[in-house]
Amino acid sequence: MNLLYTLIATFFAGMGAGLGTGFAGMSAAAVISPILITFLGIDPYMAVGIALSSDVLASAFSAYTYGKNKNLDIRNGLIMMVSVLIFTVVGSYISSLVPSTTMGNFSVFMTFLLGIKFIVKPVMTTKESMGNVSARKRAIQSVLCGILIGFICGFVGAGGGMMMLLILTSVLGYELKTAVGTSVFIMTFTAFTGAASHFAIGGFPDATVWILCVIFTLVWARIAAVFANKATPKTLNRVTGVILVVLGIAVMIFSRLS
C-alpha cells in the first residue's frame, strides 16, 4: 500500500472524524469507516474497529477539554452510560436481523438532518434553565434516554453519537456545550468497548493505518474542542450544523463509491 496515499486518506478521515467528535460528539466510525473501505480497501469490520479505537483518545481528550470548561455533566453521564452499554447489546442483536445498508443510510441521513436543525433552529438553552430540573428527574431521564440511545447505537452502529446529541439537547434540555461534553465523555467508554471487541474478534489491524487514524483524529478533535468551548452558543450552533451537513454529504458520497 502506497504510504503517501495512505497518509492522505487517513489525514482526511481523521480530520473529518476529529472535527465531528470535537464539535458535535459524533462517532468517528461514521466518517473513518467509509473512507478506509473506499480508498484503502480495508475490510469493513476492521475499518469500524480502527474508527472506534480512534474515537477513544479523541473523545477522552475532548471530554477533558469540555470538563475543564465546566461543560460536562459527569453524574448523569455515568448513569446514562450504564444504560447505553447494556442496551447496545440488545440493539446489536436486533440489528443482525436487518440489512446493513438500511442501518448505514439511517445513520448518515440523521447526521445530515441534525446539521440542518442546528443551522435553522439553534440550541439556545442556558445552564441556568438546565438547573431548574430536579436531580431525581434528571437521573430518571438519563436512564430512559440511555436505554433508547444504547438500543439505537447497537442497532445503527455509527449513529450513537448523533442520537446522544439529539436526545441531550432536544429531550433532556441540555445546552449545546454541555450536551457535546457529556456525549464525548460517554463515547470514550462505548468506543473503547466496541474497539476492544472488534480487535478481539477480528484480530489487530494494519498498524500504519491504525496509528495514523488515531493521531489525526486526536489532533483535529483537540482543535475542535478548544474552539467549541471558546465560541458563543450561536456561533457553535452554526459551525456544528455546517460540519454535520458537510460530513453527512461526504459520507453519503463515499458510501455510494464503496
Where do the model's predicted regions map?
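Juxtamembrane transmembrane-helix boundary motif
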Residues: 1-19, 33-39, 44, 65-151, ...
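Alpha-helical transmembrane segments of polytopic integral membrane proteins
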Residues: 33, 53, 57-60, 112, ...
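Transmembrane helix-bundle signature of multi-pass membrane transporters/permeases
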Residues: 18, 48-56, 180-191, 244
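A small-residue-rich subset of transmembrane alpha-helices
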Residues: 54, 182-198, 208-221
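Membrane-interface alpha-helices at helix entry/exit sites of multi-pass transporters
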Residues: 42-50, 75-76, 173-184
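Short, structured loop/turn "capping" segments at alpha-beta junctions
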Residues: 126-127, 158-163, 174-178
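Transmembrane helix boundary and interhelical junction motifs in multipass membrane proteins
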Residues: 23-32, 157-167
